[in-house]
Amino acid sequence: MEGIFAAYVLPALIIALKSVVLLVVLLIVVAYLLYADRKIWAAVQLRRGPNVVGPWGLFQRFADLLKFVFKEPIIPSGANKGVFLLAPFIFAVLAMATWAVIPVNEGWAVANINVGILYIFAISSLEVYGVIMGGWASNSKYPFLGALRSAAQMVSYEVSIGFVIVTVLLTVGSLNLTDIVLSQNTGLGTMLGLPASFLDWNWLCLFPMFVVFFISALAETNRPPFDLVEAESELVAGHMIEYSSTPFLLFFLGEYVAITLMCALMTVLFLGGWLPPVDVWFLSWVPGIIWFMLKLCFCFFLFAMVKAFVPRYRYDQLMRLGWKVFLPISLFMVVATATFLKVFGLA
């Protein structure tokens, strides 16, 4: 009996505890990143932003949570009730499930699997089903159009993200996210005789793919200027028009969890994860999770600034950018990276 407990029950309890801690921390981080997003947008527009609930409006997100929870969920009379309520739950759960393999520090992951990046790519690809189900089950024109746009948009830009992953795989030789971070201890900077620093991270040697991944992440998460799924001037709120109360909150939460995931992936794949910007003694003393969060916040700041400054693309421009610009660039970079590694004997 003790052997069964040690072999099966205890590991399961540890994983469950890790998952609960991750979920709580993730929701708090997402709440304050959303607060930061609103503050940045307000600053650009010369407004104050959230400033009523708590000091400097710091508790605004918690007030919004209470507001959503205590509102009555309204289901349209012609909607498919079961699918209508299931869609936001699927979307939010899949968005949060992808975080299970993200290492915020060395050894700090719920599941450190060897195909971590492939797992994220597979699970995040399923999120589109939540949007499609919500748009179809609403039995309304605007949500259905938003769902169709979402399907086309996500499929189009997942191709480019897939080629970015292939390029990183060729460079590192592993799909394990921890291995990808540790491989960035050496790179272009150390080849030039410099100490380990940000010059060794993948953003420099794979800069075109860094740009492709960043812009594709904007499209994949329906962020401006690619928010065609819920374009206010055309579709009001897209697939979320008929949603209110907790179901709407789940869609909204899932969207920002997905945005935070893309920022974390940029940090892991291109910005050295938890590694300090320069490997010197006083920076190495700073816990790795602090560096990881600073880099994640920097990526989120870029997302927020794009939202504030770049006008929305037309739908045909969005598709053209994905298929006629990013796809050829991604293919070329995969071939160029493989050729370079083979010619110089680094493969």
Swiss-Prot record:
The chain crosses the membrane at residues 13-33, 82-102, 115-135, 161-181, 198-218, 248-268, 286-306, 325-345. InterPro entries: NADH_UbQ_OxRdtase_su1/FPO, NADH_UbQ_OxRdtase_su1_CS. GO terms for biological process: aerobic respiration. The keyword Transcription does not apply. Signal peptide: none annotated. It is an enzyme of class 7 (translocase). One of its GO terms (cellular component) is plasma membrane. Keywords: Cell inner membrane, Cell membrane, Membrane, NAD, Quinone, Translocase, Transmembrane, Transmembrane helix, Ubiquinone. It is found in: Cell inner membrane. The keyword Transcription does not apply. It is a multi-pass membrane protein. One of its GO terms (molecular function) is NADH dehydrogenase activity. It catalyses: a quinone + NADH + 5 H(+)(in) = a quinol + NAD(+) + 4 H(+)(out). Its EC number is 7.1.1.-. Its main location: membrane. NDH-1 shuttles electrons from NADH, via FMN and iron-sulfur (Fe-S) centers, to quinones in the respiratory chain. The immediate electron acceptor for the enzyme in this species is believed to be ubiquinone. Couples the redox reaction to proton translocation (for every two electrons transferred, four hydrogen ions are translocated across the cytoplasmic membrane), and thus conserves the redox energy in a proton gradient. This subunit may bind ubiquinone. Belongs to the complex I subunit 1 family. NDH-1 is composed of 14 different subunits. Subunits NuoA, H, J, K, L, M, N constitute the membrane sector of the complex. This is NADH-quinone oxidoreductase subunit H.
